[in-house]
A protein has these predicted regions:
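Anion (oxyanion) recognition and catalysis
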Residues: 70-73, 238, 317
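N-terminal pre-domain/capping segments
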Residues: 1-128, 152, 159, 208-213, ...
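Acidic/histidine-rich catalytic cores of soluble enzymes
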Residues: 161-304, 310, 319
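Flexible, acidic glycine-rich loops studded with aromatic residues
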Residues: 287-388
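Conserved strand-to-helix beginnings and helix N-cap segments that scaffold or border functional pockets
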Residues: 20-24, 55-62, 184-188, 227-231, ...
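Active-site acidic/histidine proton-transfer and metal-coordination neighborhood
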Residues: 90-215, 225
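Active-site beta-loop-alpha junctions enriched in small/polar residues
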Residues: 11-15, 46-50, 81-84, 133-137, ...
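A short acidic (Asp/Glu
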Residues: 54-57, 89, 140-142, 185-189, ...
């Protein structure tokens, strides 16, 4: 049992790009200079739906893009197929979960991503991965059979991925990414859904395809925000034979003793921003979890009674993974260390990707340049992995 020996990946969703030219420009401007600093590096690509469409419908465009990656020595073995549209819009928030997994557009986009990755995947790499939305956003209205509808679409996708393997010889696996306030957010919810998914797959004689091609993307930040024991969570997924196809190396914000820690709450208020959703959880001494769908300045500065009484808050804000603290704020880096220690013991050998997409919205004038910040994240992650 060991960790993946593939080059460490970092996710390009930190860079905007709604055309192929814009994606290549981001890779040239940021990814290549980061690689110059850190050495071998994989590009975990976020390719929005317009980019995927351009690659598949413009003659020669996909071959041109593949040549660009090869010419620049950039390895790609994973795509982030979670954000469908503009992940750098002025306001993304809950729209990032659209379309959900009942929609034809989500299925088609994901399959198109698989077709692109099958072309980009280097021949020496056995399989590629796609991370995706955890069905949908829990706060939206859904029909009573929503999870069954999603399951049927995922089974359809597994069948299509199996056919793609027959056509191309390339194996592409899906990685469903649980996230706070989504239909799948906790490990228990994920375990329950996979039972449902597999029962329906068996009814369609597609159980083998689902076992092989549908797994999870374990985002350490997300499960830490839920106050889960990440080691137990990972072992529970393995015990249920749910493949961990991808791990997002990520950290969240922690506030200890928030009722008396006014300085931390003042600093936390500066992290409330209009683009991304920052789901917030507070845990009381008796283990009760209090939930807030999005961090606001008011919630940080003047929390309600339940949150004020909590011993600790955790906030879904991806912060640099090399940071143990951010001034008076703490991070969930200890959970990241525990998660990677556990991953090393598992039978699965998931793809490993650093995913800190929030550099543009991080507060503070003293933060490093994006290139230097990403490079330090990669170096810190390598040190962490090497010391396991």
């Amino acid at each position: 049992m060991t960790l993946s020996t593939l080059p460490l990946s970092y996710c390009s969703n930190v860079h905007p790009g709604l055309t192929v030219d814009e994606v290549m420009s981001g890779l040239t401007e940021f990814t290549l200079p980061v690689r110059e600093q850190v050495g071998e590096l994989a590009a975990g690509l976020w390719l929005a739906q317009p980019v995927i469409k351009e690659l598949l419908t413009t003659d020669g465009r996909l071959d041109q893009f593949a040549s660009f990656l090869q010419d620049h020595g950039l390895t790609t073995y994973t795509l982030n197929a979670f954000p469908y549209g503009n992940f750098h819009d002025a306001r993304v928030k809950e729209n990032v979960y659209l379309p959900d997994w009942t929609r034809d557009s989500r299925v088609q986009y994901t399959l198109d991503c698989a077709r692109v990755l099958a072309r980009l995947l280097p021949p020496e790499i056995e399989w590629g991965s796609l991370s995706t939305v955890p069905l949908g956003f829990k706060e939206f209205e859904h029909p009573v059979d929503f999870q069954d509808q999603c399951a049927q679409r995922l089974i359809d996708l597994a069948q299509s991925l199996s056919r793609l393997r027959d056509e191309t010889g390339r194996t592409i696996r899906l990685a469903i990414e649980p996230e706070p306030f989504c239909v799948l957010e906790t490990t228990d919810e994920t375990l329950d859904f996979f039972q449902r998914l597999r029962k329906l797959a068996a009814d369609r004689n597609l159980l083998d395809e689902v076992y092989d091609l549908i797994g999870v993307c374990y985002d350490v930040c997300h499960q830490a925000v839920e106050f889960e024991d990440v080691a137990d969570s990972l072992r529970g997924l393995q015990a249920a034979e749910i493949a961990i196809n991808k791990v997002h190396i990520s950290c969240a914000i922690r506030v200890e003793n928030p009722s008396t820690n006014e300085e931390a709450r003042r600093v936390l208020a500066t992290y409330a921003e209009p683009r991304y959703l920052h789901q917030t959880m507070g845990r009381s001494a008796d283990g009760t979890i209090h939930r807030l769908v999005d961090l606001t300045k008011e919630a940080a500065l003047n929390p309600d009674a339940d949150f004020a009484a909590a011993d600790e808050w955790r906030i879904h804000f991806h912060v640099p993974v090399n940071a143990e603290s951010l001034g008076p704020l703490q991070t969930t880096r200890p959970d990241l260390k525990t998660a990677l220690e556990t991953v090393k013991t598992l039978a699965d050998c998931p793809h490993l990707e650093v995913e800190t997409y929030t550099w543009e919205v991080l507060p503070g004038a003293e933060k490093p340049s994006l290139i230097d910040g990403l490079a330090e994240e990669i170096r810190a992650t390598r040190r962490l992995l090497n010391n396991l």
